[in-house]
Amino acid sequence: MYIISHPHAQENKQRCFVATAAITANQSFEIAAWRPRHNPWLIALTVTLATFMEVLDTSIANVALPHIAGSLGASSDESTWVLTSYLVSNAIILPISAWLATRMGRKRFYMSCVALFAASSFLCGLAPTLGMLIFCRVLQGAGGGGLQPSEQAILADTFSLSKRGMAFAVYGMAVVVAPAIGPTIGGWITDNYSWRWIFYINVPISLISLYLTHRLVEDPPYLKQEKERRKSIPVDYIGLGLVALGIGTLQLVLDKGQEADWFSSHWITVLLALSIILLVTWVIWEWRHEHPIVELKLLKKRNFATAMFFMFILGAVLYGTTVLIPQYLQLLMGYSAVSAGEALAGGGFIMMLMMPLSGFLVSKMDQRVLMSIGFATTAAALYYMTTHMTLGMDFRTAAMLRVYQVAGLAFIFVPSNMLSYVDVPPEKNNQISSMISFIRNIGGSIGIALLATFITRGTQQRQTYLSGHMNDGNPRFRQMIDGLTATLRSEGLSPSDATHKAYARVAALLSQQASTLAYTDVISALAVIVACLAPLCFIMKRPPKGLAAPSLH
């Protein structure tokens, strides 16, 4: 007690405090001042190459499933595990990629992911059986899971604040454009070569990415220090197990739920309950743990929490409609898979133009205003879609509707990514990137599952409603049946056959109209949800002007 109260001891304590503060300030300055030795744009293109390839693989295999099933002697239901296995392993790696990058070193982790992705892609192409292909897809998903968050963290450290918007725009082009053109590329490769080449094509691109990453990418000093510090910290095996099992079972439920008719399936119900229990337990455990795998306490940061919410909605809208629109074109309008993919491709190309524009604007105007414009534009485009989605629309109309729908997404993606780093220390960049990528992908999975379910239920409800008006007591219905019967009789059918066929045609038309109304109902609901988000953008804080970069991360 005497030592603490001694005047000299107090003076020494104050000096230590000042010295510690000075060291912390110097470290923050060094973190902010650090820049890689090589051209940042070469680094951006290098890491974007692998990310584009990985995101492309989430959708490129969709159109090849019938060919894969036929080649390997599998049923259509069995072949869907080629997609599910990839998505499940990918979803498990995403939230823990920040922890892995910190323990291994981000560059080493990133290169390991690219190498695993390349090797497993080659093995996918060689797979002699469906079981082997599914196993290789699990490895491929695990390798791909670390690429998106690692790239975003690398870009955040590589670029100064003033240029980060354009860097995130480059990243956005990979994440947003790849799913849009994946089905088209997959269909073209499958039709002209073989389904195996949708996997082989990854190998040379991965090797180029590996070489360029080795030569150009480097870990910042703070990350090297964090890696050394982590060596003495015990691994949170319980948190690791909980998140892996919880996310894995949730992704499995989302991917197979609609196919199994959700809660009418016992195994889906059990898996969903298990995933909820595991994830709730994981959140409680991680929140209290001193050294968690995923630092959930970052959600106390207003900007980051808001960005997570926005990215969840963005994922649901982007990936949900990427599945929804081709489905509508194929099932109701008779498009082939390739033609449906081509209708979406225009949206991908417009995103390639809008992303750089958004990257330029974030440094010129209030990012919150830009996001608000993005939400308002997207909501208006979704509503516009509902007024033009008919069974008689042509290919040009379908393609332009997709262009309108995605044009505003760039104004959401880039500024929300930028603002998510406000008030977050640089050493947490890996965590921010990992959680943003994870929530966007989970939003996509949940969006796809919910939209598909609502369309199925909505079609049934609309069909029941319309059927109530289809009876012989309705003059218009009677007139339609009589007209069709007369037309069919003129083609040589007997009166009874013509009548039966007329009723069958009306029933088919009723089913198509019910489905169309269900699609427009779902898209209208999306438009309302997105429109409500426009004013919420102003919850986020702007980056303070004139402050050093560390406080802006």
Features from the language model and the residues they span:
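Small-residue-rich alpha-helical segments with characteristic i,i+4
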Residues: F168, A180-P183, G187, T321, ...
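Hydrophobic transmembrane architecture of multi-pass small-molecule transporters
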Residues: T20, N26, E78, N441-C532, ...
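Cytosolic juxtamembrane N-terminal segment immediately preceding the first transmembrane helix
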Residues: Y2-A50, E54
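Structural signal for alpha-helical transmembrane segments and their membrane-water exit/capping regions
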Residues: R215-V217, L254-K256, L278-E290, F454-T459
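Helix-loop-helix hairpins in multi-pass membrane proteins, especially solute transporters
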Residues: L94-L240, F349
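Symmetry-related core transmembrane helices of the 12-TM Major Facilitator Superfamily/SLC fold
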Residues: F199-H214, V243, L271-L278, D521-F538
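Transmembrane core module of solute transporters
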Residues: H38-T102, Y110-C113, G125, G131-I134, ...
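Central mid-sequence intracellular linker of multi-pass
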Residues: V203-G248, W267-V270, V294-K300, Q460-S494, ...
